[in-house]
């Protein structure tokens, strides 16, 4: 049985207070988990110079004490492998660093991504935007206004995607302002929010935010970013229940990560945990080839084999679509599972 860390974090603590009390030092993180730093772990600490370590205590509380290979820990702990310069890996794997206006990416025909905030509650070591120039694409009302003018001038945009960073790092009053502006643009029908905050700090789903979503004329979708069943807890389930009650469509996308979820049984457990929380598995992405994350790479052939096995373990509606994102392409690219044809 896993031994879970106790951090004395009040279940009802304000999300901003939790956000201000994240762990940023690898030594403190290992100490909380009662893990002795060996030579390899010590060598990895310098990787925070490449990309800062940042982990909420509520997320640490779901990690197993004494286990340096805990799948949640592996997603956030600095590693010496981040210094490896691997062929084909770059600082801009999706060719995103040239936005049409500051903070707005018009990547797809009918959809645009608004980078609402540059920061995240948790820094995931595999993040494809770990090198993104957020300083040039700051989330503030001035840049948002320019982006909204662009959206209003492009009637083909019927869906806006709030991304980041993490868009739910914006405070409720900021999200209220953005929603109000989007609701005034008649051709915008849907708002899709991609966020990891509801899983790492479930208290982010405030009653005020839920009520604002309930009032909106827009169809609102929340795409959670969850990679392992151990991330899902009761607090997350309660947050999702509140959102379901007001009609928010709940989806999840994962990244296939070596040493975290690279087997069918683990993915089946994740699909079951998500479905129990009212969240539909949506996409399983192969790793974006971002510099510093090559040690998480799972090959396409391995990914196909894992997915073929997953199909035998869960119902079809609980199987996410295996896909990769290719810079410059007009949509995500599904990976053919190479199933036998009758």
UniProtKB/Swiss-Prot annotation:
Keyword Ribosomal protein set for record: no
Annotated EC: 5.4.3.-
Ranges for domain Radical SAM core: 106-329
Keywords for the protein's UniProt record, in alphabetical order: 4Fe-4S, Iron, Iron-sulfur, Isomerase, Metal-binding, Pyridoxal phosphate, S-adenosyl-L-methionine
Domain of life (superkingdom): Bacteria
One function term, GO molecular function aspect: metal ion binding
Cofactors named for this entry: [4Fe-4S] cluster; pyridoxal 5'-phosphate
Phenotype seen when the gene is deleted: Cells lacking this gene are highly attenuated for virulence in mouse models of infection. Salmonella epmA and epmB mutants share extensive phenotypic pleiotropy, including an increased ability to respire under nutrient-limiting conditions, hypersusceptibility to a variety of diverse growth inhibitors, and altered expression of multiple proteins, including several encoded on the SPI-1 pathogenicity island.
PROSITE patterns, per database record: RADICAL_SAM
Residues at which [4Fe-4S] cluster binds: 120, 124, 127
Matching SUPFAM superfamilies: Radical SAM enzymes (SSF102114)
Presence of keyword 4Fe-4S: yes
Reactions performed catalytically: L-lysine = D-beta-lysine
Entry-annotated residues carrying N6-(pyridoxal phosphate)lysine: 332
Cofactor mode of binding and number, as noted: Binds 1 [4Fe-4S] cluster. The cluster is coordinated with 3 cysteines and an exchangeable S-adenosyl-L-methionine.
Free-text function comment from the UniProt entry: With EpmA is involved in the beta-lysylation step of the post-translational modification of translation elongation factor P (EF-P) on 'Lys-34'. EpmB appears to act before EpmA. Displays lysine 2,3-aminomutase activity, producing (R)-beta-lysine from (S)-alpha-lysine (L-lysine).
Family under the similarity heading: Belongs to the radical SAM superfamily. KamA family.
Name of this chain's protein: L-lysine 2,3-aminomutase
Gene behind this protein: epmB
């Amino acid at each position: 049985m896993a031994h879970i860390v106790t951090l004395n974090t009040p279940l009802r603590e304000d999300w901003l207070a939790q956000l201000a009390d994240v762990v940023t030092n690898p030594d403190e993180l290992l100490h909380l988990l009662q893990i002795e730093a060996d030579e390899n772990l010590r060598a990895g600490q310098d990787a925070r110079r490449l990309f800062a370590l940042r982990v909420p205590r509520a997320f640490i509380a779901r990690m197993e004490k004494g286990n340096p290979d805990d799948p949640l820990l592996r997603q956030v702990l600095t590693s010496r492998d981040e210094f490896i310069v691997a062929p084909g890996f770059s600082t801009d794997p999706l060719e995103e660093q040239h936005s049409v206006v500051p903070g707005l990416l018009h990547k797809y025909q009918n959809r645009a991504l608004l980078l609402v905030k540059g920061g995240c509650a948790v820094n995931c070591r595999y993040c494809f935007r770990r090198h993104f120039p957020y300083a040039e694409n700051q989330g503030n009302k001035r840049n948002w206004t320019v982006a909204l003018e662009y959206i209003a001038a492009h009637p083909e945009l019927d869906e806006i995607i709030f991304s980041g960073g993490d868009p739910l790092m914006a405070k409720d009053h900021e999200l209220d302002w953005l929603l109000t502006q989007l609701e005034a643009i008649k051709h915008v029908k849907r708002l899709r929010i991609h966020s990891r905050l509801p899983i790492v700090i479930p208290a982010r789903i405030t009653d005020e935010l839920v009520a604002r979503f309930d009032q909106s004329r827009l169809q609102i979708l929340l795409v959670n970013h969850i990679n392992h069943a151990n991330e899902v807890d009761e607090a997350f389930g309660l947050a999702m229940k509140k959102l379901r009650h007001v009609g928010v469509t709940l989806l999840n996308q994962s990244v296939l990560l070596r040493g975290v979820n690279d087997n069918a049984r683990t993915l089946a457990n994740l699909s079951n945990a998500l479905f129990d929380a009212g969240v539909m598995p949506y996409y399983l992405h192969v790793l974006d080839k971002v510099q510093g994350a090559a040690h998480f790479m799972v090959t396409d052939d391995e990914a196909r084999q894992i997915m073929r096995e997953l199909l035998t373990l869960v119902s079809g509606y609980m199987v996410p679509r295996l896909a990769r994102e290719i810079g410059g392409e007009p949509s995500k690219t599904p990976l053919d599972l190479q199933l036998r044809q009758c």
